[in-house]
């Protein structure tokens, strides 16, 4: 829900001023996957520095729902967030998000994963992927 996204991100930004905040969002619930909140979601990401969103077509394994009438248009949501002066990206798969985050995350960044499900296991795979990147980039 846009209010939950907005208050979560605003609270984190307030608690950690000066830190770069990366919001990673999976619109998985029936409510969040609908276009009903299309115009409310962009404002919800104002407190973050980077918004990363899983396309509805892959969110929660509901293949094809992005094509349904009334589904949240994630590419358009991404453009709306960018028009508000934020960096934003959308991806079709969790693996693409993981790869993007491994390139983007820097020391000191705060990364929050938002989903009402397991986000394709991202909370488990991302730390391991970041550790591999760190090991590969450490001078020997």
Enumerate the language-model features and the residues they cover:
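ATP-dependent carboxylate-amine ligase
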Residues: 1-140
């Amino acid at each position: 829900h846009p209010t939950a996204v907005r208050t979560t991100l605003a609270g984190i930004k307030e608690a950690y001023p000066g830190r770069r905040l990366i919001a990673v969002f999976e619109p998985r619930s029936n409510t969040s996957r609908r276009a009903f909140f299309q115009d409310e979601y962009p404002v919800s990401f104002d407190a973050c520095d980077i918004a990363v969103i899983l396309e509805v077509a892959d969110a929660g394994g509901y293949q094809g729902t992005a094509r349904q009438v009334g589904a949240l248009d994630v590419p358009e949501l991404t453009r709306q967030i960018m028009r508000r002066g934020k960096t934003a990206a959308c991806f079709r798969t969790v693996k693409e998000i993981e790869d993007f985050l491994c390139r983007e995350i820097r020391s000191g960044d705060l990364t929050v994963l938002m989903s009402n499900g397991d986000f394709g296991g991202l909370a488990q795979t991302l730390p391991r992927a970041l550790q591999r990147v760190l090991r590969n980039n450490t001078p020997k």
